[in-house]
């Protein structure tokens, strides 16, 4: 059996576990535009699913994205896709999401802007960070808790990016 076929079988199994019934993929359409991941829209004829695929080593990136979506969803401020699952096959990892309808910019745009503003007004803690690390594209991003926004941003956003640049041979000098 080909690696791709094994991957699609693994995806069907995760979706079957999520939906409580066998998920027979009847249609697969590649979605253009992903720079880091391969993206697909699949359906069993009833439930469309958005699929992000990458090498097996990217599973932790997909797990972090799923955790972030679930965390943001708890704010009840903005419409986000439901996470159906994260999984792996022999050579691939994948993130399975509710397929949201894509629409042209309409009069719903101001509503989305209002929801986004509400999201940024949510405050659940006086500290900055997360209980888990995340990813910025293909790059790991630490999120250790810090009581100071300025220190968090300087060390774990700007400082971290400068360190990544230095590791790749780009040195901006001493910033301490």
Question: Where would I find each of the regions flagged by the language model?
Answer:
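Short, Lys/Arg-enriched N-terminal segments with co-localized hydrophobic residues
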Residues: 1-6
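Short, conserved clusters of charged catalytic residues that mark active-site
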Residues: 10, 23, 64-67
